[in-house]
Amino acid sequence: MKNNIMIMNFSGVYEMQGLKTALEKKVDSVVAEAENMAAKPVITQLDFQDIPGTNCYCDSLAEEEIGKRIIPFGPEGLHFLDSGNYHYLTKLWLELVKEPFELLVFDHHTDMQCPAFGGILSCGGWIREALETNDNLKHVILVGPPQAAMEETKKELAEDGEELLGKVTWISEEEFLQNVEKPNWIQKLCGQCNVTGAEADEKEQLPLYISIDKDILSESEGKTNWDQGNVVLDQVLQFIDVYMQQTPGRQFIGMDICGEDPEADNEEVQTVCRKTSEKICGFFLC
């Protein structure tokens, strides 16, 4: 897997945070301590503010243009997507994966709303659209939405048939948090997700792509522009670590993060958000 880093600028929030400079320092620190890192990660910042029709909903022209700009980079690496309004960008990165794979999503929302406005890609329905249109996406693990929201989404998916419903493993915020104090709680939850794709080798697991929306986290770890959950970042990172350990040799494709709040002009708030991004970056590189 390539360990390069992409910062996607739609709202200007990353410039407000000074994220690129902070990540450069983080990379230098990790490289200095690493003993076997093949190459120093490259940080690329691309500006998309010239593309209209991207906020919350992504029209077909914008989707095509964004897709063209990210093709040269491939799906590998760590991608910063801006606010949760742009979480649909994950779908575009997934379209660059050219083999069967699995998607692990941490989000306070299901992001599986029925298409609206003529089926335009949206931040609220991108997972559903990816399941419907990406033949290589074999399985989705969704961690973090409230139980009630999950049950409502399951009903909506069931109305369209059992095929989509059968491709999703659900872990609600309530289930995730109620196991925190139990021994081996992460192993137990990961065990629910340990699914081998039908097209994968019987001895291996499908390659994995991970997407994190910071709105799964409590506001103490970063304020977003959406309603938020109560999960702690360390719990998310530990879950990922244990899940990967349960399938030795699994290919890790890449990861993305969204969930900034461009409207928060408080320097302290943006600093907390940036530090959360730095922590995720450090985890990714190690």
Describe the residue ranges of each PLM region.
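Long, hydrophobic, well-ordered secondary-structure blocks that form the structural core
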Residues: 103-115, 126
